[in-house]
Amino acid sequence: MKIMRKNHPLLKIVNHSFIDLPTPSNISSWWNFGSLLGICLMIQILTGLFLAMHYTSDTTTAFSSVAHICRDVNYGWLIRYLHANGASMFFICLFIHVGRGIYYGSYTLSETWNIGIILFLTTMATAFVGYVLPWGQMSFWGATVITNLLSAIPYIGSTLVEWIWGGFSVDKATLTRFFAFHFILPFIITALVLVHLLFLHETGSNNPSGLNSDSDKIPFHPYYTFKDLLGILLLLMALMILALFFPDILGDPDNYTPANPLNTPAHIKPEWYFLFAYAILRSIPNKLGGVLALILSILILATFPLLNTSKQHGLIYRPITQTIYWIFIANLLVLTWIGGQPVXYPFTMIGQIASITYFVIIIILMPISNTIENNIIKL
């Protein structure tokens, strides 16, 4: 009898993607984060769907509807905290996934890498519009400040901001459309994930050694399905600990105050996963310059395949670039810390130094270290 999974039109696709997929035999746990991101996306869509059943996207009732979910809906508090902290877990996995891609040279698979950048931007957009929905103080002022950045665009800026707001300030129209965006974007992300996987399976996975692994492949199932299962269990355990014991540790206390357009919070700041980009934005005194730096802080990832001149794949045998890479990671952590600090000396100065370092490492130091290492190989 023919094996159904190999011949059925639909199951055949699943089989080639998750069961009989030829995978390098030496990929480490750093390759687990792709599947963990898939699990995070599923958790977010499911919890989000149940939240959307009880949420109302109206300025007068949005805050109360979130309180109602936590108080009156069966396990509503759990669904809400799983969704809020699930976003944090999503971004932790996302940052590690991108960091692994840079370290092991996965950016040489340029189609997969570029779709990944689009996915990163779409996920950031989804998280931003989602943060506005509870309609607390930080939700309202975060939306006001970030959308207002578009007014820096010459000629059409002010009109564009009013068009996005649906009026002359962040109000009911803004909240309604942000809810619509927040509902549809995860499904767009899901479609992009399929394209991401399609491109990845065209070329095959990268591996820690950076060498061609065509001669040494093993089937994805059962080897990597069980390896991924361990990662998934650890992720779920971390998420449950976060949601049950420390549900508000990554949130902002100001968001437990209903939105008030007449009262500005002392320090307006986004969620922790945007702080690095927010620090880069704040470090430039000019509004348009800050917006451009903010956009470039993400889009600069697209330059990795272009600026890579190394004759070796990945950083595993390249100590100079390895050192620069870890300085880059430390610099990112400094930017994240600075983004959450008030705009005052010495934080502004540290932020400016860290922002310059961020771009200098990628555009100047990494290509130079590539050239040095290429010359060392020739010796």
Curated annotation (Swiss-Prot):
Keywords: Electron transport, Heme, Iron, Membrane, Metal-binding, Mitochondrion, Mitochondrion inner membrane, Respiratory chain, Transmembrane, Transmembrane helix, Transport, Ubiquinone. Heme b b566 binds at residues 97, 196. PROSITE patterns: CYTB_CTER, CYTB_NTER. It is a multi-pass membrane protein. Heme b b562 binds at residues 83, 182. Its main location: mitochondrion. The cytochrome bc1 complex contains 11 subunits: 3 respiratory subunits (MT-CYB, CYC1 and UQCRFS1), 2 core proteins (UQCRC1 and UQCRC2) and 6 low-molecular weight proteins (UQCRH/QCR6, UQCRB/QCR7, UQCRQ/QCR8, UQCR10/QCR9, UQCR11/QCR10 and a cleavage product of UQCRFS1). This cytochrome bc1 complex then forms a dimer. This is Cytochrome b. It comes from Necromys lasiurus (Hairy-tailed bolo mouse). The gene is MT-CYB.
